[in-house]
Amino acid sequence: MATTWPPRTVIRKSSGLRTLESALYRSGLGPVAGVDEVGRGACAGPLVVAACVLGPGKLESLAALDDSKKLTESVRERLFPVIRRYALAYHVVFIPPAEVDRRGVHVANIEGMRRAVAGLSLRPGYVLSDGFRVPGLAVPSLPVIGGDAVAACIAAASVLAKVSRDRLMVAMDAEHPGYGFADHKGYSTPAHSAALARLGPCPQHRHSFINVRRVANGSGGRVVADCKPDLPLQRDEGR
């Protein structure tokens, strides 16, 4: 009888972040890359996607790895340089708001995952994606629900994407004062909604989101003139 690989029981009953990756490495399917995104639900700023390949060994310096959303900012900042130092390869992709609007957030997310994996300096033997199937990859892949809490490579990618995006949003706050990007990181908070209503959208806002579109339509399409659509930090990075 045909079986699927990796066995679903490995995913459901994983006893640690390295269980699934270790099984893939033992089966000769490494290197294993994890891929994750941050900013999918934000109404401003880029969608940021990262891919990361960790070695098969366990590193004590990465013991704190988990879903980036569960970690404090200080822990994420501490892990960020450690991941970049010890990763066999990583690549971070920035999908600008205009492309998110043009493609739609889900399609942009999948495209970002493809770009992140393609940008790795080390070709993976297998790719684990957080939650979404990623068609069009050149290597076998598996979507893992809650993958950033199951696979260390996905958790590492999550941290890389989260810290990269948060730092960009802080820089964007200085470029576009008044919106509070450094605080809410582009997500729809009451403070952000109030600033959006007061100032109108800037080019970093996603018009495919109904709250932005409503404000833009209500203000006659007004866009803040001194908002700069491109920031130097919005470049893919990796090794």
UniProtKB/Swiss-Prot annotation:
Major subcellular site = cytoplasm
- According to its UniProt record, this protein's enzyme class is hydrolase
Cofactors, names only = Mn(2+); Mg(2+)
Pfam families per record: RNase_HII (PF01351)
Keyword annotations: Cytoplasm, Endonuclease, Hydrolase, Manganese, Metal-binding, Nuclease
CC terms in the record's Gene Ontology section: cytoplasm; ribonuclease H2 complex
List the EC numbers from the record: 3.1.26.4
Q: Which cysteines are joined by disulfide bonds?
A: none
PROSITE patterns in the record: RNASE_H_2 (PS51975)
Name all RNase H type-2 domain ranges: 30-221
The record's subcellular location field reads: Cytoplasm
- Per the record's keyword annotation, is Nuclease included, yes or no? yes
Task: Please name the InterPro entries in this protein's record.
Answer: RNase_HII, RNase_HII/HIII, RNase_HII/HIII_dom, RNaseH-like_sf, RNaseH_sf
Single GO BP term: DNA replication, removal of RNA primer
Report the catalytic activity.
Endonucleolytic cleavage to 5'-phosphomonoester
Would you indicate the residue range of the signal peptide? none
Annotated a divalent metal cation binding lies at D36, E37, D130
Q: Name one GO molecular function term.
A: RNA-DNA hybrid ribonuclease activity
Task: Give the family per the record.
Answer: Belongs to the RNase HII family.
Q: What does this protein do?
A: Endonuclease that specifically degrades the RNA of RNA-DNA hybrids.
Q: Please state what the protein is called.
A: Ribonuclease HII
Gene this chain is encoded by: rnhB
